[in-house]
């Protein structure tokens, strides 16, 4: 099986696919900017995956089925999305937001390709920053009084079963998608991360997180390794030169705001609703 993945490992849905590929021991190529075909159809939406040079697909739950995992039920997928609440706080500190994204290393072995992609990747980060703030301004999402509540359905489910993972003796779609959410929360720490660490009601969730981190101890895209046991190293960064290229690109995006901002909204309209 030949797999090409477009995406950045800050996305929970990209993480779910990468975790699935790692679990199945399937080699893949990861690119940090969208292929032209993907850009024309879906903008910068991620992940996008092509299997054996077939058509690109963007629904992570469906991609996991193609990789050999059982489908996730609609109500479970909704519970995964509920656990993603709080994502809007990623942009509370713009400097931290851009600094953390600058550390996402492109995987190409070619210096020229890495440099080009890290420059262009700055637009995707600019897009994400604009999108999150646009949603905050228009929808004005309210913080819950208790961030831990969004995990209680998972806690109850885990406590009622005997297996190490939600889907049995090995991780399945529910495990991969939910663990992807945790990676997103940990990549730029947001308020929903804290109850996973210390809420007395979420003992089972911490046991599950420990099981996942042991299972994926050699997974190269894990951000939660600094927050839960056993500890796992953070993803390897791109190096100072490539970070500098990213920030040069980011400065260019802001300098060209009359062009880049309208482009962001054009690409937003391509995202399926």
Indicate residue ranges for each PLM-predicted region.
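Membrane-penetrating hydrophobic segments
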Residues: 238-251
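Acidic carboxylate-rich catalytic motifs and surrounding loops in phosphoryl-/glycosyl-chemistry enzymes
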Residues: 32-35, 171, 222-227
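GST-like domain detector, emphasizing the conserved glutathione-binding G-site
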Residues: 1-122, 166, 248-273
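Juxtamembrane amphipathic/hinge helix adjacent to a transmembrane helix
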Residues: 149, 193-241
């Amino acid at each position: 099986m030949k797999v090409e993945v477009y995406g950045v490992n800050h996305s929970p849905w990209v993480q779910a696919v990468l975790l699935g590929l790692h679990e199945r021991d399937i080699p893949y190529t990861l690119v940090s900017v969208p292929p032209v075909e993907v850009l024309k159809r879906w903008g910068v939406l991620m992940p996008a995956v092509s299997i054996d040079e077939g058509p690109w697909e963007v629904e992570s739950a469906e991609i996991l089925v193609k990789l050999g995992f059982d489908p996730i039920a609609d109500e479970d997928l909704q519970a995964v999305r509920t656990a993603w609440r709080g994502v809007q706080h990623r942009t509370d500190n713009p400097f931290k937001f851009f600094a953390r994204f600058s550390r996402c290393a492109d995987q190409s072995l070619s210096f020229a390709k890495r440099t080009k992609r890290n420059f262009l990747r700055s637009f995707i980060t600019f897009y994400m920053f604009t999108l999150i703030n646009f949603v905050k301004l228009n929808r004005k999402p309210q913080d819950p009084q208790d961030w831990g509540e969004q995990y209680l359905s998972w806690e109850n489910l885990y406590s009622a079963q005997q297996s190490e993972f939600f889907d049995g003796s090995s991780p399945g779609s529910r495990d991969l998608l939910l663990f992807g959410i945790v990676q997103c929360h940990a990549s730029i720490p947001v308020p929903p991360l804290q109850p996973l660490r210390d809420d007395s009601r979420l003992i089972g969730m911490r046991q599950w997180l420990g099981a996942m981190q042991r299972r994926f101890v050699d997974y190269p895209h894990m951000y939660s390794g600094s927050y839960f046991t056993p500890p796992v190293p953070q993803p390897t960064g791109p190096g100072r030169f490539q970070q500098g290229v990213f920030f040069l690109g980011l400065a260019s995006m802001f300098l060209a705001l009359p062009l880049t901002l309208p482009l962001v909204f054009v690409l937003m309209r391509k995202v399926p609703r």
